[in-house]
């Protein structure tokens, strides 16, 4: 475990820092104006972070001309979200293809994928071995009041709907704890097997799929995920002017449905793992139709050459010959070589949006999960980082108080959230107007926490990292001290982005 500790003293009363009813440091200029002395810290890109194991920082002292009543100290960290830890394959052992996650509420988590039987693969020149005979037994599982049967897979059970025959598409599993999974049967059919995303709208699951593969998103509306039958097929939802799809859907707090979609108009996607430098963005009031395209969420195209070239897709004309007479598509050649992303998944934490997807770097290097962030889904997203190896086709969900990043590889990931521990704070007050601190609070660890928002699967409440000062004495000056300890085993570290001291 890394034990990097930073001691940071910030007197938030420097010149040009007082504005209205708060004192704020939140930009490069603010930090530079506020700092009186520092050792062992880097102040860059509007943040403060440790250069080594320890560091110190003091800001210029400035006193108020009258007593003020402090309410709280709030600390905000960088949104880069590198605080991920690997875990063994998440979800049912026999879930196949790209996993799709859906959080309905506390203790009500769903995972969708194709149903595999885990039949042993045959060695070359040999016949495949048969699965050992298995006799299901009646079972009970906390949180499930329906009849259950054991399965040949550990921590997995069949509900009545799970005994229905498959239809060649995706199946549904439900969990109360992200450890034990109950199979409820098929939710899509063979032609709709290219499921990319799911959302929760007014008590119904919206299950989105490409038809044909890598083309216009279609949608099922399922008001009963327990019956082992697909819901109502509403047909095409997004008429995509480009090729690519592999779309992720997210509903905003106003109820609008947003889609983030691959756009292959500037790349030979067949040579780049069917990914693209462009992520299109469209929005609909109902998630069923009427999607209007906006500016791209991600646009990392290089220079267009004006040359038009073609590539071939293996599925279009075969799967939907009525709408697609050919498998050949055009694209405009761009130079130099471009990064490519895709298989999008989205989540929003306290208004900060994140896009997770495939990351296929230039030069033929290994694929991984990459992610972007933006303070608004209507603004361009900026690159954060990457993790893992292999073609991920990821999805993300908030469950059991933490965040799960599922991939189609053997390794998945879990995170407590974008906040990186450990930050301990105390505040001092000058009550006598002599420029010296008369009283300090105790040292208190502060950190963000996260919670569900009723009725929303991918919108997560952020509770800020704050110190309550409402019972603190009034004063002419206030001083803040922070201790920051990097307690993670991953590459993340606490990066302080802003401090805000608020007053009555």
Indicate where each model-derived feature is located:
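Short glycine/acidic-enriched loop and turn motifs that connect beta-strands
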Residues: 116-121, 212-215, 264-269, 360-364, ...
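Surface loops at the rim/top face of extracytoplasmic beta-rich domains
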Residues: 214-217, 223, 254, 259-286, ...
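Bacterial N-terminal signal peptides
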Residues: 7-16
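Non-cytosolic beta-sandwich-type ligand-binding/adhesion modules
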Residues: 21-86, 127, 172-175, 218-224, ...
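Surface loop/turn signatures of beta-propeller and other carbohydrate-active proteins
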Residues: 24, 28-33, 37-63, 80-105, ...
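Entry beta-strands of beta-propeller and related beta-repeat scaffolds
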Residues: 106-111, 203-207, 255-259, 352-355, ...
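Positively charged n-region of N-terminal signal peptides that target proteins for export
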Residues: 1-4
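Loop/turn-rich, solvent-exposed surfaces of beta-rich toroidal or solenoidal domains
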Residues: 323-373, 407-420
């Amino acid at each position: 475990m890394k034990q990097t500790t930073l001691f940071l003293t910030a007197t938030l009363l420097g010149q040009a820092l007082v504005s209205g009813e708060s004192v704020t440091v939140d930009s490069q200029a603010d930090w530079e104006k506020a700092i009186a002395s520092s050792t062992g810290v880097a102040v860059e890109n509007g943040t403060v972070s440790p250069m080594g194991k320890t560091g110190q920082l003091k800001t210029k002292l400035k006193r108020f001309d009258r007593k003020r009543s402090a309410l709280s100290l709030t600390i905000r960290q960088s949104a880069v979200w590198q605080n991920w830890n690997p875990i063994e394959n998440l979800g049912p052992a026999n879930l196949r293809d790209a996993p799709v996650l859906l959080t309905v509420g506390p203790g009500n988590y769903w995972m969708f994928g194709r149903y595999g039987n885990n039949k042993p693969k045959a060695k070359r020149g040999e016949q495949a071995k048969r699965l050992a005979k298995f006799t299901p037994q009646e079972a009970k599982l906390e949180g499930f009041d329906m009849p259950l049967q054991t399965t040949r897979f550990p921590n997995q059970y069949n509900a009545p709907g799970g005994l229905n025959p498959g239809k060649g598409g995706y199946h549904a599993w439900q969990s109360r704890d992200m450890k034990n999974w109950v199979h409820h049967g098929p939710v899509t059919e063979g032609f709709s097997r290219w499921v990319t995303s799911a959302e929760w709208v007014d008590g119904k699951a919206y299950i989105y799929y490409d038809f044909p593969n890598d083309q216009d998103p279609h949608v099922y509306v399922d008001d009963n995920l327990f019956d082992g039958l697909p819901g109502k097929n509403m047909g095409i939802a997004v008429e995509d002017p480009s090729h690519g799809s592999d779309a992720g859907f997210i509903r905003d707090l106003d109820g609008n449905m947003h889609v983030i979609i691959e756009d292959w108009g500037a790349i030979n996607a067949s040579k780049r793992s069917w990914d693209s430098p462009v992520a299109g963005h469209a929005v609909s009031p109902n998630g069923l139709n009427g999607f209007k395209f906006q500016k791209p969420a991600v646009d990392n195209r290089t220079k267009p050459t004006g040359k038009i070239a073609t590539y071939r897709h293996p599925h279009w004309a075969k799967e939907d010959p009525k709408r697609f007479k050919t498998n050949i598509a055009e694209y405009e050649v761009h130079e130099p070589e471009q990064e490519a992303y895709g298989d999008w998944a989205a989540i929003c934490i306290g208004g900060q949006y994140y896009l997770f997807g495939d990351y296929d770097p230039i030069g033929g290097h290994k694929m991984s999960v990459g992610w972007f962030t933006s303070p608004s889904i209507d603004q361009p997203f900026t690159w954060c980082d990457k993790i893992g190896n292999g073609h991920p086709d990821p999805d993300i969900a908030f469950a059991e108080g933490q965040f799960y990043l599922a991939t189609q590889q053997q390794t998945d990931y879990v995170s407590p959230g974008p906040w990186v521990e450990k930050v301990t704070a105390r505040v001092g007050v000058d009550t006598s107007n002599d420029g010296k601190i008369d009283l300090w609070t105790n040292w208190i660890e502060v950190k963000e926490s996260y919670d569900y928002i009723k009725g929303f699967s991918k919108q997560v409440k952020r509770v800020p990292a704050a110190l309550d000062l409402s019972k603190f004495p009034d004063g002419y000056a206030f001083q803040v001290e922070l201790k920051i300890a990097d307690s993670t085993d991953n590459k993340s570290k606490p990066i302080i982005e802003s401090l805000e001291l608020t007053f009555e």
